[in-house]
């Protein structure tokens, strides 16, 4: 499956072929579109169509030469409505200077000059001809060339350059965009020669689930042991309301009982039971001594 229709300088290395196979770029769908048949290598017994990796590499180089031929990188528009390709097109645009449309393509971007998002690119590159059909349709109205990542079941109408690959897997999509960006930079001279390794790793082009990344950050920021519950926490005396304290020997020492303790009740305790109690502060007057008192 090695490419044979390219000049020796554009030949793929064994590492490139291994990366394409590892990312499963050669695995198509069970359906086959008639115009994608030349890129088919064989059909497996389970019905999966296998794409010729050599043809994939040839089309990557061809697409890179077309992109490098455009003087102004801002005249290139890269589009992906498929979530797995949105991160890849943003990275491709950042590294090559192209304009990225990640997410829903607003109808009229290429045909309605009244809209704020109106663009007049000289070339568009799409991730999936089926999900990005609106962009391809509008490009056909205004004669804009189209480069597309095409699976075995992808429609190729109005597609000028089809890169045969698996356009449904996150790793396959990211790898194709990464290789395309690397070849463009090599042709532009940003990379000194083909032996120079690109310092950008392919992982940056892979799709990442935002919820999974958020949960990962939350797990990393948790305080160790904060989630402990059960026997260990109960034994340590940390479970319960704030008024509960850990039991210790002699805990009742010095604890007053509400409703029974009277301040100073132990003062002036006498052991002589014959002694009379002290008279009250106010005593009754003697009627015989005071004649004014009448009974």
Curated annotation (Swiss-Prot):
SUPFAM superfamilies for this protein: Ribosomal protein S2 (SSF52313)
Matching Gene3D superfamilies: Glucose-6-phosphate isomerase like protein, domain 1
GO cellular component, as recorded: cytosolic small ribosomal subunit
Predominant location: cytoplasm
Single Gene Ontology MF annotation: structural constituent of ribosome
Keyword Cytoplasm part of the UniProt annotation: yes
Pfam family membership, one: Ribosomal_S2
Keywords attached to this entry: Cytoplasm, Ribonucleoprotein, Ribosomal protein
Subcellular location: Cytoplasm
GO BP annotation list: ribosomal small subunit assembly; translation
UniProt record similarity statement: Belongs to the universal ribosomal protein uS2 family.
Function: Required for the assembly and/or stability of the 40S ribosomal subunit. Required for the processing of the 20S rRNA-precursor to mature 18S rRNA in a late step of the maturation of 40S ribosomal subunits.
Quaternary structure note: Component of the small ribosomal subunit. Mature ribosomes consist of a small (40S) and a large (60S) subunit. The 40S subunit contains about 33 different proteins and 1 molecule of RNA (18S). The 60S subunit contains about 49 different proteins and 3 molecules of RNA (25S, 5.8S and 5S). Interacts with RPS21.
Protein name: Small ribosomal subunit protein uS2
Organism placement in taxonomy: Eukaryota, Fungi, Dikarya, Ascomycota, Pezizomycotina
């Amino acid at each position: 499956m090695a490419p044979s229709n390219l000049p020796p300088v554009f030949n793929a290395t064994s590492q490139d072929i291994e990366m394409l196979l590892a990312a499963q770029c050669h695995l198509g769908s069970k359906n086959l579109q008639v115009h994608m048949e030349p890129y088919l290598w064989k059909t497996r017994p389970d019905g999966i169509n296998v794409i010729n990796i050599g043809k994939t590499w040839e089309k990557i180089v061809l697409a890179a030469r077309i992109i490098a031929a455009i003087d102004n990188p801002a005249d290139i528009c890269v589009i992906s409505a498929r979530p797995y390709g949105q991160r890849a097109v943003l990275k491709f645009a950042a590294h090559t200077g192209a304009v990225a449309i990640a997410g829903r393509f607003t109808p009229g971007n290429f045909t309605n000059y009244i809209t704020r998002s109106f663009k007049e690119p000289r070339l568009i590159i799409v991730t999936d001809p089926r999900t990005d059909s609106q962009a391809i349709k509008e490009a056909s109205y205004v004669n804009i060339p189209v480069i597309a990542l095409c699976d075995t079941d992808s429609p190729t109408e109005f597609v000028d350059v089809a890169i045969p690959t698996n356009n449904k897997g996150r790793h396959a999509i990211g790898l194709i965009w990464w290789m395309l960006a690397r070849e463009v930079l090599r042709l532009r001279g940003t990379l000194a020669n083909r032996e120079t390794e690109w310092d950008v790793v392919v992982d940056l082009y892979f799709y990442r689930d935002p919820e999974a990344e958020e949960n990962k950050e939350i797990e990393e920021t948790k305080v160790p042991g904060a989630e402990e519950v059960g026997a260990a926490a109960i034994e340590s005396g940390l479970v319960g309301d704030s008024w509960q304290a850990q039991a210790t020997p002699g805990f009742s020492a010095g604890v007053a009982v509400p409703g029974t303790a009277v301040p100073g009740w132990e003062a002036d305790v006498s052991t002589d039971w014959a002694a009379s109690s002290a008279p009250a502060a106010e005593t009754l007057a003697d009627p015989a001594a005071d004649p004014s008192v009448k009974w």
